[in-house]
């Protein structure tokens, strides 16, 4: 089996980002981004997706977190697209429900080749530890656009914003794990009746 790894660099006037992933990893993660709450959430993707992630970023954090959060999503999406290759043999679809105390979120993903995001998370607060939670929409939009996936994110219950976000990222990691997993019965086959994704 070919290694499903990728390294991507994104260099703009706003951010400089390096991301490396291993889709067949063990959940190892290393981050140097400068946005602690984002790093905490990315760790959920790695651990629950069993995907090795290594991301470094230097950005205009003196302005705010927006460009860094969005560009990390873009770069991670590019890395996924590169690592997954032609998509032959993958399960393609993934889904997960994850609870955390009172919060419950559902994430469904399709490596369809068609970018689309439906995100319905009624945050109960605007910030967590100084982090603007609206930026997670920018993160996921960047990921979707560059991984070329359809992604549905719904928080079904929850009153604690930290719990809402954490359940989203844990479910996202688990859905990714399911979708990128190789299916022995589909070896070498495209998971689409069109023959292409």
UniProtKB/Swiss-Prot annotation:
Its EC number is 4.2.1.19. It comes from the Bacteria. GO terms for cellular component: cytoplasm. NCBIfam families: PRK00951.1-1, PRK00951.1-5, PRK00951.2-1, PRK00951.2-4. Belongs to the imidazoleglycerol-phosphate dehydratase family. This is Imidazoleglycerol-phosphate dehydratase. GO terms for biological process: L-histidine biosynthetic process. It holds the Pfam family IGPD. InterPro entries: IGPD_sf (IPR038494), ImidazoleglycerolP_deHydtase (IPR000807), ImidazoleglycerP_deHydtase_CS (IPR020565), Ribosomal_Su5_D2-typ_SF (IPR020568). The keyword Ligase does not apply. It catalyses: D-erythro-1-(imidazol-4-yl)glycerol 3-phosphate = 3-(imidazol-4-yl)-2-oxopropyl phosphate + H2O. Keywords: Amino-acid biosynthesis, Cytoplasm, Histidine biosynthesis, Lyase. Pathway: Amino-acid biosynthesis; L-histidine biosynthesis; L-histidine from 5-phospho-alpha-D-ribose 1-diphosphate: step 6/9. It is found in: Cytoplasm. It comes from Pseudomonas fluorescens (strain ATCC BAA-477 / NRRL B-23932 / Pf-5). GO terms for molecular function: imidazoleglycerol-phosphate dehydratase activity.
């Amino acid at each position: 089996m070919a290694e499903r790894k990728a390294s991507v660099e994104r260099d703009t006037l706003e951010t400089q980002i390096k991301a490396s992933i291993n889709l067949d990893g063990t959940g190892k993660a290393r981050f140097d981004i400068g946005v602690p709450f984002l790093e905490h959430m990315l760790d959920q993707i790695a651990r629950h997706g069993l995907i090795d992630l290594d991301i470094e970023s230097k950005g205009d954090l003196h302005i705010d977190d927006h460009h860094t959060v969005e560009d990390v999503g873009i770069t991670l999406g590019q890395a996924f697209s590169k690592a997954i290759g032609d998509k032959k043999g993958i399960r393609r679809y993934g889904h997960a429900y994850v609870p955390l105390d009172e919060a419950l979120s559902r994430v469904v993903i399709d490596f369809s080749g068609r970018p689309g995001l439906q995100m319905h998370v009624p945050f109960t607060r605007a910030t967590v530890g100084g982090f603007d939670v609206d930026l997670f929409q920018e993160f996921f939009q960047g990921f979707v656009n560059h991984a070329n996936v359809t992604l549905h994110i719904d928080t079904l219950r929850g009153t604690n914003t930290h719990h809402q976000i954490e359940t989203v990222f844990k479910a996202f990691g688990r859905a990714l794990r399911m979708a990128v997993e190789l299916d022995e019965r589909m070896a070498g086959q495209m998971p689409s009746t069109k023959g292409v994704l």
